[in-house]
Structures are given as C-alpha cells and as structure tokens.
Swiss-Prot record:
Pfam families: Ribosomal_L18p. Keywords: Ribonucleoprotein, Ribosomal protein, RNA-binding, rRNA-binding. CDD domains: Ribosomal_L18_L5e. GO terms for biological process: translation. One of its GO terms (molecular function) is structural constituent of ribosome. The lineage of its organism: Bacteria, Pseudomonadati, Bacteroidota, Bacteroidia, Bacteroidales. Belongs to the universal ribosomal protein uL18 family. PANTHER family: 39S RIBOSOMAL PROTEIN L18, MITOCHONDRIAL, LARGE RIBOSOMAL SUBUNIT PROTEIN UL18M. It comes from the Bacteria. GO terms for cellular component: cytosolic large ribosomal subunit. This is Large ribosomal subunit protein uL18.
Length: 114
C-alpha cells in the first residue's frame, strides 16, 4: 500500500513525462506545504526559473485559500512583467482542488492562459 506522498510523487513523474515547458509556453509548477504555497514558472529547455512567487513574505495572516489566491495574482503579475502570457499548468501531483485550484483561478483572472 502506498502512502499519500508516494502516490503524489508517482503522479508527479507520470505527468512530468507528458508535459514540458518551453520559452514560448513555460511550465507553471505549484508546490504546497502545510503552511505555505510556492509557484514557479519554469523554462524546462534551459532549466531556468522565469518567475516565482510564494506566500512566505506575506505580512498579514489570512486563510490558506485566500493566501493561495494572492500568490496566484502575484505570479500572474510577475509573468506579465516578464512577457509571459501562456503557460502549461503543472499541479505537481496534487489534486486540482482547494489551494491548487485557487492558485490556478487567480492566475487565470490575472491574465495568464493555460
């Protein structure tokens, strides 16, 4: 029997084999810890992070879903500053639910297409 983390890692690698970020359409990767959420926009061909945002520097205490929505808005803003309009969404093995969904919805509302 596999644990939740082992299951997530299996899904993560299976999906990673199918999607890849390019300079024109980079990969937007989400990592979720118990307290924080991190988002990176990555060009896999050159191995470079083009933009990143996280909930680490937030001063005010808010609910985790609200925190995720703010991070989604931040990454959309940083992506537009870097000239990125479309991305491939990589949920990193997490279910498309809760905080991961909030990040995606906020990024879409901020102007990113995926």
């Amino acid at each position: 029997m596999t644990t939740k983390i082992e299951r997530r890692v299996k899904i993560k690698y299976r999906v990673r084999n199918k999607i890849s970020g390019t300079a024109e359409r980079p990969r937007m990767s989400v990592f979720r810890s118990n307290k924080q959420i991190y988002v990176q926009i990555i060009d896999d061909l050159s191995g470079k992070t083009l933009a990143a945002a996280s909930s680490l520097g937030m001063a005010e205490k808010v609910a985790k879903k609200e925190q995720a929505a703010k991070v989604g808005e931040m990454i959309a803003k940083k992506a537009q500053e870097a000239g990125i309009t479309t991305v491939v969404f990589d949920r990193n093995g997490y279910l498309y639910h809760g905080r991961v969904k909030e990040v995606a919805d906020a990024a879409r509302n901020g102007g990113l297409k995926f």
